[in-house]
């Protein structure tokens, strides 16, 4: 989920250049909320039954987002389409707020001064905070009012943003981690390029065949690059069907402490991840995100773990130098890693307000953004999953998957998971991830043992949770 994000394309989708105006249907006006309301409480009262936005002044909405580059262009295309369809009734203005961490920090400050956005795109790490903040108006209020069919959202995607049966935000740009691999390197090593490894244990066993050295004994090609990312720890716990935190993984209540220390999941992942470096399967430089990507693109490592959302940009960067393969996110081993993955990425949040016209306008915009045609367009331009299942039936989506079959792996992995793999919620998740990543890096650099890394993670995260819960007790 990271954060940040996922990530983009040009060559990936020349096939859909003709999709510039995707003419989304069923998005007429109806509207309203005040810019950045600061009401307290988990949810607002039931929204007004109906609001006619075809009369009265145009409703202006401010939309804060964290999309850059190609993603930002695709986003603006969608917004322009919406504004054209609703001219004179609703106008949405997009404002880039930097990466996800920057955006949520700005959001916290702005909402206190009542100068925040009407609609806010935030990463999955911000979910628990935004639910608890009292600033947001749950999507479930509008779903229930309009009897909007929530089943049109992929269940495995909706699960992350659903707590106690209530969908709080609308999934928008969703992704999961994948194993990317160099099929040509597999062939050269005498390995079947259609049978990629499924676990870290298997990757370690294959590493000698994928390793090449120069006359001095230095590795010129290694097996894998997998950076020290807290998301990969979380996903490994999901694959093991073990929670990251107590209190239902942060879903039945605010987490008070981590669970990965006592359930064995943390130790299992740290041992397997550390062994990648210790065995020589992964060069130490490849524990860095940029280095891991560069090494893979340039043939210095044969496998690379990253988000599904980088598929497009990888294809562009590789530019035909080798055939790119995709596989499911690797578990620790085939004995414990029998579960699925949860989604990362971001969702759309509606701010609370007493202005019924603004609330209705926000709801219309959000429905537009997740319509089948809109999500098919968004997928082909960015590489994020379509969150709406009907988007899979759109011609532009089918054409794209046919041209880039690697993306089918991401779809299959998502559908082979289950809502039970929804993932954890934590109001200080960004801080948690930083602690995890710092301690993993120290372990990989031989500054501490696996046991010390696990203890340091546990102690620091539990202390941070205690401080947060004490200062936010209701």
Q: What does each of the following model-derived ranges do?
A:
Residues 46-53, 124-178, 204-206, 234-240, ...:
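Hinge/lid segment of periplasmic solute-binding proteins
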Residues 81, 85-153, 187-190, 195-198, ...:
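Extracytoplasmic "Venus flytrap"/periplasmic binding protein-like
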Residues 84, 88-91, 189, 271, ...:
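Extracytoplasmic/periplasmic substrate-recognition and gating elements
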Residues 109-110, 118, 149-186, 221-222, ...:
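A structural signal for short loop-to-beta-strand junctions that line the ligand-binding cleft
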Residues 137-153, 196-198, 214-216, 222-224, ...:
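Short, solvent-exposed loop/beta-turn-alpha elements that line the ligand-binding surface or hinge
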Residues 160, 327-329, 380-438, 442, ...:
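Long, aromatic- and glycine/proline-rich binding clefts that accommodate carbohydrate-like moieties
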Residues 163-172, 177, 187, 201-257:
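Extracytoplasmic/periplasmic solute-binding protein
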Residues 205-208, 251-285:
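Glycine-centered hinge/linker elements that transmit conformational signals in sensory
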